């Protein structure tokens, strides 16, 4: 029995380098970082000074005022990105005519932490009477996927995962499984995060995982660079319309790429450090290749997790060499977080969108801010400038806190 084939028909990024498909892609082509100084709160109590902050966000473009009272910032990003993706896919929706074969698979690491901190401050100042009565339904992690389903009338599969930095990739991979196994025909898959709060930045600063770069903020995130000193936190969301191939063809949808393979596993080792042997990362890539029914040498480009930490980038390089052998030196491997920072649970979805566009446009995005080669990261990291290439198959890695490893493989539709 042949497997149901699964494709991507809509893309809706909201990041610090652009909102919507073309704005985002133009930001990538510009080869400049969207990272800047934090302005949403005073970071002077911390050694962290910069983030991938979305300064031009205007929620009233997407929502009437009464809706905003019930949406945390991360849920605003989620619902807005879903609308961008649905419109890009030219997919018809209506709350008055709900659809039972259309679902939502979304990811977030921290959910409504922004609203939680805001309301806790209100509680300290005014007591319980100062707290919004809708607080409970704004802060829980599932509020993003629930609000997407409510907004657009999708009554099919509904799920939220909170797999740290791998959440967005997991949401895409699980959408593949739901559709392949005939639980749905269409899934809105993605991730959203709005973690720029004192409690979140402070917590990561304490454990010394974030960059303490004090120079030009645009240079703070330096994947694979010898002098990288930690990840840069960001915010945003991306939704992808994941659809069964014949369903997409029947409605004459534009098809960007096919979702071919997915894997998910755990290091079972440490909350912040990767498994020294790289065994689980290696298995994740090999399992995704097996699911996609591809040989390692067929991959044309790898979008690495490459969070700009000393441990992660080196460990990922070692794992790629183990999986791809002699092909590891030939296959371009870029880390793209220098553009949009690391929006935690949204990152994997952002990178899935970037890989989808790379396939569609036949162009490999670079590792920007690469200045000092690291002998431990001796791959073709596509330094500073992108390049045209013949791309048929792309792998995207997400290796998150807690040792959660996810990998998806995309390809051109044949």
Give the residues covered by each predicted segment.
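Condensing-enzyme catalytic core mediating Claisen C-C bond formation in acyl metabolism
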Residues: 5-9, 36, 215-292, 300-301
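Active-site-proximal alpha-helical scaffold in enzymes
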Residues: 78-91, 141-145, 149-152, 157-193, ...
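ACP-dependent fatty acid/polyketide chain-elongation machinery
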Residues: 1-67, 246-258, 353-367, 411-414
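Phosphate/pyrophosphate-binding loops at sites that engage ATP/ADP/AMP, CoA/4′-phosphopantetheine
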Residues: 42, 85-98, 247-255, 284-301, ...
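Glycine-/small-residue-rich "gating" segment that lines the acyl/pantetheine channel
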Residues: 125-132, 170-173, 177, 194-250, ...
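Acyl-CoA/ACP chain-elongation machinery
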Residues: 39, 183-229, 262-276, 306-313, ...
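Conserved beta-ketoacyl condensing-enzyme motif
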Residues: 8, 23-24, 32-163, 192-201, ...
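Conserved small-residue
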Residues: 10, 28, 82, 104, ...
